Structures are given as C-alpha cells and as structure tokens.
C-alpha cells in the first residue's frame, strides 16, 4: 500500500523550496506520495516560519488539529521543521507532545534517518543543528515543475538586524559551490525550465567556492547562470542594500536575461529607525543604489519590505518613510506591523507605539504603494510585453496566463502548446491584480537561444585545417 505524505508550508520562498526538496527526498527513500488531504497521510510535516508572531501561534493551532488525527491513527508520524522548530527545539514538544520529529532548516536532509528512528524505537527525535552545506550534498536531483524554478544558492545571514530571527534560526551565511548551483540549473533547463529564481536570506552576499579553489561573486554567478542554454530569465530574492555592489549593477547593464524587477528591502525611510534596526545604511544610500540601477536599467521596477510601528517610531519617522516611498515610487511591497521576536535585541526595546497608530500607518503605507502599482500598470497599456506562459488562467481555463518581467500576471487567448514558452503580448487593459493582453507573436518567431546538444555544438564549431582534418574550437 502506498504511503502518503502531507506537507504544510508557511513563510518565505526558501521554505517553499525546502518543502519541495523534502517531498522529493522522502519519495526516493521511503516511497511517500504527496497528498493534499491530511486525513489520508501516514506522515504529516509542517514547515514553519517565525518571522511573525501570528505565524508562530498558527503552528500550535494546526498541531492541535493534527493531534486529533494521531489519536485516531497512532501510527501517524508528525514532524515540524523550519524556523519555529529551530527556535523552539525541545520546548515545542512540551507544548505539543504529539510531535515525533523536530528538525531545522539545515537538517531536513536527515529526515529519512529521523523517520526510521521514530518507526524503530517509537521515540521522538530532535535535530536542529547547523551542519552548514551538508544538506545540499544529500538532497535528490532537481525536478522541474513547470517553466519556472527556485534554486537555493546560499543560506543564513550575518547581518543581525535587531528585529530579525533569521541568523538564530537558519544560522550564518553559507554559500553553495558555484559549480553545484550551475549543474542544478542546467539539469532544470534540460527539463524545460526557462526562468530561475536564485534564493537566499541575503542572496547578494553570495561568495561560493569554484572548482579551482577561487571564490565566485554574486555578480559572476548571475552572468554564469544567464549563459546556461535555455535559461532566458533570471530573478533573485532577497537582497540587502549594503551588499548591493556596483558589479551587481553592471550585470543589469549588460545581461538582458536578468529581469527588470528587483526586490530590495529597506524597512524604513528614517535614518534614526534604520540605525536602531542595525541596517547599516541610510535612506540616502538606499536611494543612491536605486539611482544607479535606473541608470543601468531605466525600466526597472522596485519592490521592498517595510516595518511600521518599530519601537520608538515617531510620526516624523513614518513621514520620512512615506517620503522615501514617493521618491523611489515602489511598485509593490511586503509591509507589516512590527512584531517583537523572542531573543532579538529589538524585543527588549519599549514598544511605545499604540496598536491603533500602527494599523493606521500600515493602511496609509499600503494604500500609497497600491496606488503607485496601479499607476505603473496603467502605463503598461499599449506596450508590448514578453510573457512566460505558466498555464491556464485561474478564472478562465480556456485562456492562458503568464508573467511579465515586472511580475505582472497577464491573461490572454492562446493555445495549450504555448505553455512553458515565451510569447509577446500587447497590454490592452488593467485590473486590480492582473493585466489583459492580445497575442502578437510566439516563441518560434523570436530570436531566442535554442537548446543545443553536444553534436550540434561540434557541428557548429567544426573547422578544417589545410589538409582537410576536422578541428573543433568551442
């Protein structure tokens, strides 16, 4: 009888990536098949996030529901991973004794052994250690699920912003070797992936070892990824302003595969608050980065993260944030009310901004950025946009949907054979969360790089010397 696995994932794209790797790993080692129905599962895994306080409380609420399933099926194994698991450790089992396996973001590759331990001894296991890069060496080969894919290139963060738990839950920065990353992306490209999104908590701090013992910078990695045959779009998230160096900006100047969209968190427009957050940059320095980016790529759109109601934030501080929002003209944002996280320096600061004031500031900020996003969308009407077709439209299965470089969803009429390929569409209408397009040309009418085999490369590069002997010059 086939064993079933149900995974619930909360949090960032890195968690989504980790969950997909867990599913692949357990399919290869134990034959588990994914199910969307928890009641069918033999193994329940919860991949958690501890960035927000509410997300942490949601963990124990869901575990209360899963406890009822375990009472009906004592053989059911329940595992909790991710940042809450890393932060809580053994204390998690004290609040939720139904949990059998507790693992951190850096130990998910040990899940098969942990599950075997539980099955063999009927006792729980906890492993929230930080074995650095080991997890990537023990994960199965990548498996494409559509034309886009996430690839983790580094983990952890050394910045220790006063509000953030990431350095404590995912450890300090560790970069994967560049050759491993390029090989994984080449494997995905061979399976039809056209767009790759490079992941890391502080992705532009990447410094990976090369095969010859040198160090590959993030800018160098971007160019190498863009050169992989079949990869026509490159994205990355999430980056930090103090690591956004001029050599990265130069890649925007000369590498068209790198999309004209950047998520660059700033958190606040007040230098005083930025100092209290230990962000190590000013609002003016952030604006200077954006100015240089727009010189290199005039059509680039910027999104960001904001925290409102940070301890000590005054009305003047908030107004400086709103001024930055207007100056940069952000496209989208992920904005939140400050939530103190246990163990972080900011948690010890007096939280002297009222809840009512926090909610009002958040509403003003989100409303302004939504207005700016709509202005940008309206300016796209009449333009031709290259869209990567991801599948059928959510609202009408007779239509197709894809994404522009600046991450707008476009719905248009087309044929199923366009899925997984690029098309050019003219934008003709704007809606709250999508655009309407008319198909202009398909991929076979574009000058994109074709997939090449070793034989085609040899044939293309073959030359003959003076006596007619074939030589090859790659």
Swiss-Prot record:
Record-listed E.C. numbers: 2.8.4.3
Pfam families associated with the record: Radical_SAM, TRAM, UPF0004
Top-level enzyme category: transferase
SUPFAM superfamilies: Radical SAM enzymes
PANTHER family: CDK5 REGULATORY SUBUNIT-ASSOCIATED PROTEIN 1 (PTHR43020), MITOCHONDRIAL TRNA METHYLTHIOTRANSFERASE CDK5RAP1 (PTHR43020:SF2)
UniProt domain Radical SAM core: residue ranges: 143-375
Role played: Catalyzes the methylthiolation of N6-(dimethylallyl)adenosine (i(6)A), leading to the formation of 2-methylthio-N6-(dimethylallyl)adenosine (ms(2)i(6)A) at position 37 in tRNAs that read codons beginning with uridine.
Needed cofactors: [4Fe-4S] cluster
A GO molecular-function annotation: 4 iron, 4 sulfur cluster binding
SUBUNIT field: Monomer.
Entry GO terms, CC: cytosol
Localisation per UniProt entry: Cytoplasm
MTTase N-terminal domain: residues covered: 3-120
Taxonomic lineage: Bacteria, Pseudomonadati, Pseudomonadota, Gammaproteobacteria, Enterobacterales
Annotated [4Fe-4S] cluster 2 binding sites: 157, 161, 164
Record field: catalytic activity: N(6)-dimethylallyladenosine(37) in tRNA + (sulfur carrier)-SH + AH2 + 2 S-adenosyl-L-methionine = 2-methylsulfanyl-N(6)-dimethylallyladenosine(37) in tRNA + (sulfur carrier)-H + 5'-deoxyadenosine + L-methionine + A + S-adenosyl-L-homocysteine + 2 H(+)
GO biological process: tRNA methylthiolation
Note on how the cofactor is bound: Binds 2 [4Fe-4S] clusters. One cluster is coordinated with 3 cysteines and an exchangeable S-adenosyl-L-methionine.
Protein name: tRNA-2-methylthio-N(6)-dimethylallyladenosine synthase
Positions of the TRAM domain: 378-441
Gene3D superfamilies referenced in this protein's UniProt entry, alphabetically: Methylthiotransferase, N-terminal domain, tm_1862 like domain
């Amino acid at each position: 009888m086939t064993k079933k696995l149900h995974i619930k994932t909360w949090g960032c794209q890195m968690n989504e990536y980790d969950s997909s790797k867990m599913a692949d790993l357990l399919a290869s080692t134990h034959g588990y098949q994914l199910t969307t129905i928890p009641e069918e599962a033999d193994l329940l895994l919860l991949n958690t996030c501890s960035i927000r306080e509410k997300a942490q409380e949601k963990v124990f609420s869901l575990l209360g529901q899963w406890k009822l399933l375990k009472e009906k099926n004592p053989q059911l194994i329940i595992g909790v991973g991710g940042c809450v698991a890393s932060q809580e450790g053994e204390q998690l089992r004290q609040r939720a004794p139904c949990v059998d396996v507790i693992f951190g973001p850096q130990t998910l590759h040990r899940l098969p052994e942990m599950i075997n331990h539980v099955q063999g001894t009927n006792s729980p296991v906890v492993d929230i250690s930080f074995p650095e890069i080991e997890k990537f060496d023990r994960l199965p080969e990548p498996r494409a699920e559509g034309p886009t894919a996430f690839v983790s290139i580094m983990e952890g963060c050394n910045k220790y912003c006063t509000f953030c738990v990431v350095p404590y839950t995912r450890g300090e920065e560790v970069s994967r070797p560049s050759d491993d990353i390029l090989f994984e992306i080449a494997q995905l490209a061979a399976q039809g992936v056209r767009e790759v999104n490079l992941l890391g908590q502080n992705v532009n701090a990447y410094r990976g070892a090369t095969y010859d013992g040198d160090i590959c910078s993030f800018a160098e990695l971007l160019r190498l990824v863009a050169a992989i045959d079949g990869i026509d779009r490159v994205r990355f998230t999430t980056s930090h302003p103090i690591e956004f160096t001029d050599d990265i900006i130069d890649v925007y100047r000369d590498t068209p595969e790198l999309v004209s969209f950047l998520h660059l968190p700033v958190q606040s427009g007040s230098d005083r608050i930025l100092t209290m957050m230990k962000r190590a940059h000013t609002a003016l320095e952030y604006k200077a980065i954006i100015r240089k980016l727009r010189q290199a790529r005039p059509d680039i759109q910027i999104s960001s993260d904001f925290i409102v109601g940070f301890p000590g934030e005054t009305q003047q501080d908030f107004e400086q944030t709103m001024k930055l929002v207007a100056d940069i003209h952000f496209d989208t944002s992920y904005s939140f009310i400050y939530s103190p996280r246990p163990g972080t320096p900011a948690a010890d600061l007096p939280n002297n901004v009222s809840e009512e004031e926090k909610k009002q500031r958040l509403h003003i900020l989100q409303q302004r950025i939504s207005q700016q996003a709509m202005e940008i969308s309206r300016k796209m009407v009449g333009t031709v946009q290259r869209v990567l077709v991801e599948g059928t439209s959510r609202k009408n299965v007779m239509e197709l949907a894809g994404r522009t470089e600046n991450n707008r969803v476009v719905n248009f009429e087309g044929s199923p054979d366009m899925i997984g390929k690029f098309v050019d569409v003219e934008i003709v209408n704007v809606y709250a969360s999508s655009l309407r397009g008319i198909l202009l040309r398909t991929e076979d009418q574009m000058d994109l790089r074709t997939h090449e085999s070793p034989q085609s490369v040899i044939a293309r590069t073959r030359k003959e010397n003076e006596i007619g002997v074939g030589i090859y010059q790659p």
